[in-house]
């Protein structure tokens, strides 16, 4: 099951994977994300290319990912006529080299060059070793990755108590940051895509005025954990997936995906 390179699509696919009945799993192995395949050769129309045919220049980003520049002599003639096909081919090769989930986790993006850079290059087939040298372990399955993909963030809160929800947030963690970014910028692309499949994404909020004393921070986090556990106990894991939470000046927030 391919998320087509999008973290947001991993969640529905992992949910589908976990809901598969035992009668299906007796005959099928369900993997989320294209698996790495050493020696993979892509053949599509006039394209016949391997990872060994692609030169690679990698730069580590501040958030411990890599930004790639790729050059492939075999694809250069096609680049002028059909840029999208070349990007698709190279994206496919990256996925097959390190696995699609690892590509989502570790590749910040890549550029395609029509000429090689004047710097020593590695081959794309060496990307797994490069990532491992950075202390990164490749992910085989989308479920394992999502369970360990929390991103911590800090924001400058709006002090006006009448401001919109979440604008008071100063710290939080989330497994799907695009959901928060879309909300704060009044975009609905991802939520609209989820709604088409009967999926609802949102957050619960609760006032923090009742939390006082030296243990206030711990009490707020404990309450959020207890709220999450109570919902999971009563609704069941098949009904909801929690994405993280946030603490604001006036409210606490619990982010979730609800499944129909």
Per-range role (PLM):
Residues 3-5, 32-34, 72-74, 208, ...:
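Short, flexible loop/turn elements at secondary-structure junctions
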Residues 10-13, 82-93, 216-234:
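Well-ordered, non-membrane alpha-helical segments in soluble/globular domains
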Residues 25-26, 159-260:
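C-terminal structured domains
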Residues 26-34, 98-120, 233-253:
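Short glycine-rich, low-complexity/disordered patches
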């Amino acid at each position: 099951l391919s998320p087509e390179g999008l973290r947001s699509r991993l969640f529905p696919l992992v949910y589908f994977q976990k809901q598969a009945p035992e009668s299906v799993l007796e005959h099928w192995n369900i993997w989320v994300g294209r698996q790495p395949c050493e020696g993979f050769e892509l053949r599509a129309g006039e394209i016949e290319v391997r990872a060994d045919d692609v030169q690679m220049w990698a730069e580590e980003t501040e958030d411990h990912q890599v930004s790639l520049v790729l050059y492939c002599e075999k694809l250069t003639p096609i680049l002028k006529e059909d840029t999208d096909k070349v990007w698709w081919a190279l994206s496919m090769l990256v996925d097959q080299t390190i696995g699609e989930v690892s590509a989502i986790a570790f590749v910040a993006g890549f550029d395609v060059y029509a000429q090689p850079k004047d710097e020593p290059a590695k081959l794309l087939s060496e990307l797994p070793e490069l990532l491992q040298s950075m202390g990164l372990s490749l992910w085989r399955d989308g479920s394992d990755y999502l369970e360990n993909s929390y991103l911590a963030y800090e924001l400058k809160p709006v002090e006006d108590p009448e401001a919109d929800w979440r604008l008071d947030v100063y710290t939080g963690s989330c497994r799907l940051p695009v959901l928060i970014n879309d909300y704060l910028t009044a975009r609905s692309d991802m939520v609209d895509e989820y709604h088409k499949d009967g999926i609802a994404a949102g957050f619960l909020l609760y006032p923090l005025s009742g939390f006082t004393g030296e243990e206030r921070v711990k009490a707020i986090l404990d309450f959020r954990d207890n709220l999450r556990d109570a919902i999971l106990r009563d609704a069941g894991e098949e009904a909801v997936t929690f994405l993280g939470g946030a603490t604001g000046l006036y409210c606490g927030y619990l982010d979730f995906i609800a499944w129909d």
